[in-house]
């Protein structure tokens, strides 16, 4: 089990580094150059008093339509950090999802081979456990083989079907707690993404307040850009958080189903066939 935790920690660090490098590369080569080019474009047409004369133009000379470009929305550092955290969280969710898929494939295997009319006696528990003990260590540490061994060992030691069923229930509950603990870093990112967006909100409001003096003289471009930082950071953070939370809840649902199906597997194929005499 320690090797599993070490592998998860290594994957988490590697995923964070790769996410940061990938997002930074995209920002440096695509998003910020495109945003700078859009903001540098002169107004396509002068402000017109007619309603259908063309796009509204800010005092900085950039059409308002261009300010709604996705490249302009994503260009600031808060959005970059939010996207790095979101991609990292999705990598962690994907890793945990692959572990769930590996465990689910084991439900198709027949670890306890019982012929028609055969039962499992306490003295036979050790013999039925030997095929599981001969499995590779990684497979032995997965939920289904581990819970089967717990059931067989408890049945052989106590000669009680009820104690064996209780041991399986406790093992499944421990697995749920372990899976929940593994998602702590994903929950951290789900909290950190809106926090980063709030930092952008505060920065944008501060920038807008600094330009308030210019607005008194009729130049609202600075206030507009400051409020744009606020809205863009908030929008990016909220959308990223929604995506992360959606996949997080999908993963939790898959984990809960896995544990429930494993418990039903053991009850149907082992517990029901246990006999004390």
Sequence positions of predicted segments:
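Juxtamembrane "helix exit" motif at the C-terminal ends of alpha-helical transmembrane segments
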Residues: 19-37, 95-96, 196-216
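Membrane-interfacial helix-loop-helix connectors in multipass membrane proteins
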Residues: 60-63, 209-228
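Bilayer-spanning, highly hydrophobic alpha-helical transmembrane segments
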Residues: 185-209, 231-247
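Transmembrane alpha-helical segments and their cytosolic interface motifs
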Residues: 7-17, 77-81, 174-203
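Membrane-spanning helices that line or support transport/gating and their immediate boundary helices
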Residues: 29, 33, 93-104, 208-211, ...
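Large intracellular
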Residues: 1-9, 13, 25-172, 276-277
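Lipid-exposed faces of alpha-helical membrane segments in multi-pass integral membrane proteins
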Residues: 14, 18, 81-94, 196-199, ...
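Channel- or pocket-lining gating/hinge segments that regulate access to a cavity or pore
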Residues: 165, 169, 218-277
